[in-house]
């Protein structure tokens, strides 16, 4: 079938298998060009492994180090004439490329928050890997069914204590708009922490440790975004910020647990990129469009694979890791360059409907958004029929 992009709001409801595969190959090629990652991990578990930063981590570990990988994700398979999700096709392509290079790859498809998927993952580690020496936690989800209480928690994107008015882009109409966000209630804050805080990461590490599948010296990291002044009302001072502070508290206990066996636990702070999650946040399309404009002009623009490849080389397995005062690994240094942030702030209130395409890189933002779903990738013939029914070999469900 011939598949074209169909966008509704912040979701593209179609995906292109060949485009997703080409995107995965591009990321592999980037890692290969940079050469081997020295002293890297050998057996890696990535929780949230099918898109964005999690996929990039799996690619960097496999093709930069030669690591065996186990990826956990929650994706929809293709059915009849309906394509699967982008993460499904990304993972299928990863398996194909890993097999071609003789790399061990296992995947588990299901709800990472559930005890069932944790148990299935542990069984797969025992069978295929024995133990893992790196656990990457890269889960982005709007809700979580708590495995112990059965309560479903819904995350909320709201400020705390007062309403906040945010500038942004109505991406459907390509117009500047303002959104008034009302303050979160205490229950909404608690629910957001339950979904996006550190509890599930801790549950994963506790389960892996109790099962004996964490190697001596194992490391774990959870990916997060903090941002700067422009985004702080939402990302640090809002309901999501409380979840991020919970992540910072959680990592201290995990660090103590792993340090007893020569290991380590860190929160890794990554730069703002286009993801399905970020595109749904009212201010982020405008912020990203301005950030792309400024960083591309300076030659410092990076995407997921550049960020995570650098994180592994420079910080997780580098001799001189970039660590902030709170002990987080920082890969977002170029975004937070004072000159970059000053220029973004300077342009923030100047953007109008008329100059949207000149003051910002909204065109680049839109292109990156479509790439998430396999569209706009160089070398792919989007007028040619493509087979949507792609399988993932040896998938555990």
UniProtKB/Swiss-Prot annotation:
Pathway annotation from the record: Lipid metabolism; fatty acid biosynthesis
Reactions this protein catalyses: a 2,3-saturated acyl-[ACP] + NAD(+) = a (2E)-enoyl-[ACP] + NADH + H(+)
Superkingdom of source: Bacteria
Record site: Plays an important role in discriminating NADH against NADPH: 75
Residues at the catalytic site: 235 (proton donor)
Residues that coordinate or bind NAD(+): 48-53, 74-75, 111-112, 139-140, 244, 273-275
One Pfam family, short name: Eno-Rase_FAD_bd
An individual GO BP term: fatty acid biosynthetic process
Keyword hit for Oxidoreductase: yes
Annotated TM spans: none
Keywords associated with the record: Fatty acid biosynthesis, Fatty acid metabolism, Lipid biosynthesis, Lipid metabolism, NAD, Oxidoreductase
Residues that, per the record, bind substrate: 225
Enzyme class at the top of the EC tree: oxidoreductase
InterPro entries on file: Eno_Rdtase_FAD-bd_dom, Enoyl-CoA_Rdtase_cat_dom, FabV-like_NADH_b, Trans-2-enoyl-CoA_reductase
GO molecular function annotation: enoyl-[acyl-carrier-protein] reductase (NADH) activity; NAD binding; trans-2-enoyl-CoA reductase (NADH) activity
EC number of this enzyme: 1.3.1.9
Function of the protein: Involved in the final reduction of the elongation cycle of fatty acid synthesis (FAS II). Catalyzes the reduction of a carbon-carbon double bond in an enoyl moiety that is covalently linked to an acyl carrier protein (ACP).
NCBIfam families registered for this protein in UniProt: EnoyACPredFabV, PRK13656.1
Subunit structure: Monomer.
Family of the protein in this entry: Belongs to the TER reductase family.
Protein name: Enoyl-[acyl-carrier-protein] reductase [NADH]
Organism: Burkholderia pseudomallei (strain K96243)
Gene giving rise to this polypeptide: fabV
């Amino acid at each position: 079938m011939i598949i074209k992009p169909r966008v509704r709001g912040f979701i593209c409801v179609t995906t292109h298998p060949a485009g997703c595969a080409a995107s995965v190959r591009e990321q592999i090629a980037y890692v290969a060009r940079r050469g081997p990652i020295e002293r890297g991990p050998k057996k890696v578990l990535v929780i949230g492994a099918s898109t964005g930063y999690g996929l990039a981590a799996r690619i960097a570990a496999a093709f930069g180090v030669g690591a065996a990988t186990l990826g956990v994700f929650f994706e929809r398979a293709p059915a009849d004439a309906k394509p699967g999700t982008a993460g499904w096709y990304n993972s299928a392509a990863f398996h194909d490329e890993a097999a071609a290079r003789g790399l061990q790859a296992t995947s588990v498809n299901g709800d990472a928050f559930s005890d069932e998927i944790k148990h299935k993952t542990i069984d797969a580690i025992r069978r295929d890997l024995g133990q893992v020496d790196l656990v990457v936690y890269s889960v982005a989800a709007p809700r979580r069914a708590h495995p112990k209480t059965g309560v479903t928690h819904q995350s909320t994107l709201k400020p705390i204590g007062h309403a906040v008015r945010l500038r942004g882009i109505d991406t459907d109409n390509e117009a500047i708009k303002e959104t008034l966000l009302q303050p979160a209630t205490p229950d909404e804050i608690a629910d957001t922490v339950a979904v996006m805080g550190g509890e599930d990461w801790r549950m994963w590490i506790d389960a892996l440790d109790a099962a004996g599948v964490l190697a001596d010296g194992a490391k774990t990291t959870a990916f997060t975004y903090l941002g700067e002044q422009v985004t702080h009302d939402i990302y640090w001072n809002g309901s999501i910020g409380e979840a991020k502070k919970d992540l910072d508290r959680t990592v201290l206990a995990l660090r103590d647990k792993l340090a007893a066996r020569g290991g380590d636990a860190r929160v890794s702070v990554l730069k703002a990129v286009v993801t399905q999650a970020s595109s749904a946040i009212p201010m982020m399309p405008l912020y990203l469009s301005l950030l792309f404009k400024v960083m591309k002009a300076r030659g410092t623009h990076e995407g997921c694979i550049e960020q995570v490849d650098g994180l592994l080389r420079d910080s997780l397995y580098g001799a001189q890791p970039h660590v902030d005062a709170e002990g987080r690994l920082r890969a977002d240094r170029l975004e937070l360059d004072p000159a970059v942030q000053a220029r973004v702030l300077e342009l923030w209130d100047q953007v109008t409907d008329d100059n949207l395409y000149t003051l910002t890189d909204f065109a680049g933002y839109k292109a990156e958004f479509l790439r998430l779903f396999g569209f706009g990738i160089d070398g792919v013939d989007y007028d040619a029929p493509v087979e949507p029914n792609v399988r993932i070999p040896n998938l555990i469900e």
